[in-house]
Structures are given as structure tokens and as C-alpha cells.
Regions:
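Glycine-rich, charged/polar anion/phosphate-binding loops
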Residues: 55-58, 118-121, 143
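C-terminal helix-cap and adjacent tail motif
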Residues: 13, 17, 22-32, 129-162
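Short proline/glycine-enriched turn/loop segments at secondary-structure junctions
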Residues: 119-126, 146-148
Length: 162
């Protein structure tokens, strides 16, 4: 939680490790992103125009949502797209393994917003990029843990060929 303290002290968004979304997110992605955000704020009891409360809710990312374990995934900055896929598959394997042991996980891309703080606090070399964080622990009785985001039908994003 040293990172969360440092982030709150700075109270600014650091240099991004990478751009997660385009600056101008197009449809249908922007509507989907907003729908999940609004649903989450509703579970928290936060009104859409309550920006301080929305920010405070977002900052819970940087406390790993109170989970007892926080994991960072990183790799050499020079590696390309295929290696990002490898990290994602590795993360998924950890998530499946954790679930099999009765643990819950939450992958957290939000850490890309504070890469330099993570680097400094954890003494991570600049040659490495922070890909993601992940919270891990036993499920808590928390409003956000009841959120089930809407999924588009399989045939809208997949083509099966035989």
C-alpha cells in the first residue's frame, strides 16, 4: 500500500505507461464503457454528477480494492504485441488457478496511469513496462462484486469457420 499512499500524496495522474484506449473512443465501445461505469457508480450509490465521489471510487484501484494480495505484471519495454498477448494469457492462467483455489481476482489496467510511481516505489527498472496490476483474495461482501456487465452475443464478435 506504499504505492497508494504515494499516489495520493502526488494526487495527479502520472505519465502513462501506455495508452489503453484511444483518445476518441468510438461506438459501440464508448457506450459500453459508460454503461459499466454508470452501473458501478449506481452500486456504490454515487450520482453521475458527483465527480469527487467518482474519483474516490476510482482511486480504490490503487489500494487493490482492499485485497490482501496485489500483483504487478511487467515486461521489457522493447517486446512487441505478441509478448503483450503472452502476459495476458499468463494473467488468465493465474486467474483460473486462483479461482480453483477459492480465490477471486481483479485484473487492473488502471495501474498504467501511475507507472513511474510503481517503478519508483518498487524499484523496477525503467527498461520494464507495467502491463497491469491484479488484486487477489477471498471475495468480500462488496457492492462492486455484484456487478455483472452486459455481454454482446457471441455471433456479434466471432466467426466460426469449418
Amino acid at each position: 500500500h506504499r504505492i497508494a499512499r504515494r499516489q495520493r500524496q502526488m494526487c495527479i495522474r502520472d505519465r502513462l505507461e501506455y495508452e489503453y484506449m484511444p483518445a476518441q473512443l468510438k461506438e459501440p465501445y464508448i457506450s459500453r464503457k459508460r454503461a459499466v461505469g454508470y452501473a458501478l457508480y449506481e452500486l456504490y450509490g454515487i450520482k453521475r454528477d458527483d465527480y469527487p465521489a467518482r474519483k474516490a471510487a476510482g482511486l480504490r484501484n490503487f489500494e487493490f480494492f482492499g485485497a490482501p494480495v496485489g500483483i504487478f505484471f511487467r515486461m521489457d519495454r522493447e517486446l512487441l504485441h505478441g509478448s503483450w498477448l503472452d502476459v495476458g494469457m499468463f494473467m488468465q492462467n493465474i486467474m483460473i488457478l486462483a479461482r480453483g483455489k477459492g480465490l477471486e481476482t481483479c485484473p487492473q489496467q488502471a495501474w498504467c496511469e501511475f507507472g513511474p510511481i510503481v517503478h519508483k516505489v518498487l524499484n523496477i527498472p525503467d527498461e520494464e513496462i507495467i502491463i497491469s496490476g491484479m488484486s487477489m483474495g477471498y471475495a468480500a461482501e462488496a457492492p462492486e462484486n455484484t456487478l455483472v456487465s452486459e455481454r454482446v452475443p457471441l455471433d456479434e464478435f466471432t466467426t466460426f469457420l469449418s
